[in-house]
Amino acid sequence: MQVKNRKGRFSLQPDSIVNYRRLYIDVFSVAASLSQSEELFRSAAEAGVDAVFVIDAWHESHMPLARRYLELCRRYGLDCRLSEQKPAEIYAVELCDAECGAGCAVVTRDYDAVKAAERCTVLIFQRGRFWRAEDLSRGA
């Protein structure tokens, strides 16, 4: 399937998180699509997923929710990182490329991550499914 939006043209192919050894999750983005944000943390802990939860904290307005998400990370014993200088989807890509590379993935709903990724796969979470995204406008 192809998608065109204000950020470019993208190919989306169905995929699954089980195909990746580690995930870097853009928490604000994914949690916003769930009816209960705690479900993201609880289900990851119960499934034993190797994941890094990247939380937006680069603006004062993020802090109340960031504190809540950090508390959920602690409660469920998950690895969380604050993105204090840039949007979490971009920091997640940087962490993934630096720490893990091929075989790992960033999970987000934001296409900026696809444009920024070099070695890591980006999975777009839409309508309860994961889609491996490729930037078709690259090199065009």
Tell me what each language-model feature is.
Residues 20-23, 30-32, 38-43, 49-140:
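Nuclease catalytic cores that cleave nucleic-acid phosphodiester bonds
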